[in-house]
């Protein structure tokens, strides 16, 4: 009972207390703060090379804002602001900024009545975009260990830095010369083959351009040649076994007469001339004169004879001595049919020269009319091995012989030469006169003739025969296909009793039209599926 009385007493006391506090409170209609609220959600958007936009959420009751912008600053706001702006809305476009520059911006909400009640600053940091005045790299600009950068001449720039694109590490820095600045061009070295890089152009530490590139395959030991170089002079000063690696572009051999006349490069040492890119071959205008036993290799180049000052052959041997190989691979050679230089032929040997081998493979040879000479023409020399393999040869030797090889065997100890004509597409050659010879071969070493192989060729649209010479050996014929070969004696056997020495391909005959894809444009893909299955002609 005692406990119940205590609880009852406490409850009654609490009830009286609550009743005493039930007087109504006044309604709060206005709150006055010590200062304006700072802008919130401040951010920089649409940042370009010279502009940016600041946005923020408007502060309640605020009509004006003050903005300060500091250049080359990272939220320290030291020194004098670059510019100050007063606006009455929560967005502002900043203009006339400097490219690739760090900026700090801050915004204050202003109290219209009492500056002491202005808000605290809201701050933001941003960086303007770098410029892009570098032009794109051409194939010619990028080497295996170097690169050439270009930009508009006269721009204010002072250095280039190259970074490894994968790691971001700085690889090399190059200080621009006055000549570089004037010409808008700089050559940077010290790189590695087949590596991804980013090159950046600067002015006072600010980026004015950036381009990425990948260096090409290793050209160790090669002399890199660009179309702006004096290639003729480089050939004149060549050293033994020098390799010239050419970018795409046009290289005119000097020495010709007239404005457009291309001359002849004298090759008197073993050298290699190769194009760097198979799909963008450099074009050489001119010819080659071989002397003093030189060897010459041409790979991935175009040789244009249409501008030559002389219509002499592309390769002319001039001194009587022993020569290294002439190697031609994946090239294109052409002359003019009428307008331009109408070439005499492809090579010419009219001196007592011994040539280790002439190898012509994987190439396009066309429009060498042969005005004044035969196509492959050896009058007084000795070619140990002549190999013509996997080429497309068309519109050549209009009224002349294909291979001429006169008998100078006594001058060389009566050797037996080797001739291999394999896997070629030969179209519209020896088609201007009847009875021209594919093999006008009379070099009769040891009175045993020659070793000749004619295999897997596709021969079309010709009036030629193989030969009519008693000293031409019967070739070994294998799997050759013919179309529109109008002289039946191309297939005829010899009849020595009647002094007829045809030595023709008796296993061959005129077949169906191979239906070349577009011969007028040099496209000799065989569209006739039945013939294509025979694997005859150039396989490209």
What are these regions (language model features)?
Residues 94-116, 188-209:
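Beta-strand-rich modules
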Residues 469-540:
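Acidic, glycine- and Ser/Thr-rich low-complexity intrinsically disordered tracts
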């Amino acid at each position: 009972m005692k406990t119940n009385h205590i609880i009852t007493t406490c409850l009654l006391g609490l009830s009286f207390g609550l009743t005493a506090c039930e007087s109504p409170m006044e309604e709060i209609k206005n709150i006055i703060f010590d200062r304006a609220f700072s802008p919130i959600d401040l951010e920089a958007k649409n940042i370009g090379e010279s502009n940016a936009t600041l946005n923020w959420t408007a502060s309640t009751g605020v009509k004006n804002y003050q903005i300060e912008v500091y250049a080359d600053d990272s939220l320290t706001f030291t020194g004098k602001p670059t510019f100050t702006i007063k606006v009455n809305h929560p967005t502002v476009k900043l203009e006339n900024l400097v490219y690739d520059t760090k900026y700090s911006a801050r915004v204050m909400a202003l109290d219209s009545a009492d500056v002491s009640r202005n808000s605290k600053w809201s701050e933001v940091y941003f960086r303007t975009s770098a410029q892009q005045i570098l032009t794109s790299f051409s194939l010619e600009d990028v080497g295996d260990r170097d690169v050439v950068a270009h930009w508009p001449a006269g721009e204010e720039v002072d250095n280039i830095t190259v970074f490894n694109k994968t790691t971001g590490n700085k690889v090399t820095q190059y200080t621009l010369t006055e000549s570089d600045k004037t010409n808008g061009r700089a050559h940077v070295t010290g790189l590695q083959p087949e590596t991804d890089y980013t090159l950046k152009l600067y002015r006072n530490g600010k980026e004015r351009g950036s381009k990425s590139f990948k260096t090409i395959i290793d050209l160790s030991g090669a002399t890199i040649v660009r179309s702006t170089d004096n290639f003729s002079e480089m050939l004149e000063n060549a050293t033994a076994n020098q390799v010239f690696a050419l970018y795409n572009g046009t290289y005119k051999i000097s020495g010709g007469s007239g404005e457009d006349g291309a001359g002849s490069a004298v090759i008197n040492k073993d050298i290699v001339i190769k194009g760097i890119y198979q799909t963008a071959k450099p074009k050489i205008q001119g010819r080659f004169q071989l002397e003093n036993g030189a060897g010459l290799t041409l790979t991935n180049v175009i040789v244009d004879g249409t501008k030559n000052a002389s219509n002499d052959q592309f390769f002319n041997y001039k001194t009587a001595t022993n020569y290294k190989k002439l190697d031609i691979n994946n090239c294109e050679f052409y002359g003019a049919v009428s307008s331009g230089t109408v070439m005499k032929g492809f090579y010419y040997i009219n001196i007592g020269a011994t040539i280790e081998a002439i190898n012509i493979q994987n190439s396009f040879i066309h429009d060498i009319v042969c005005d004044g000479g035969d196509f492959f023409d050896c009058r007084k020399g000795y070619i140990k091995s002549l190999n013509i393999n996997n080429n497309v040869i068309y519109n050549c030797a209009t009224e002349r012989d294909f291979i001429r090889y006169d008998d100078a065997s006594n001058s060389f100890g009566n050797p037996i030469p080797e001739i291999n004509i394999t896997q070629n597409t030969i179209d519209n050659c020896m088609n201007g006169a009847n009875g021209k010879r594919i093999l006008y071969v009379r070099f009769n070493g040891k009175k045993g003739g020659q070793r000749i192989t004619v295999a897997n060729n596709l021969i079309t649209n010709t009036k030629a025969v193989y030969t009519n010479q008693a000293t031409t050996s019967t070739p070994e014929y294998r799997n050759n296909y013919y179309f529109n070969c109008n002289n039946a004696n191309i297939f005829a056997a010899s009849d020595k009793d009647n002094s007829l020495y045809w030595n023709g391909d008796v296993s061959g005959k005129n077949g169906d039209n191979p239906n070349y894809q577009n011969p007028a444009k040099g496209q000799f893909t065989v569209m006739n599926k039945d013939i294509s299955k025979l694997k005859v002609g150039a396989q490209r």
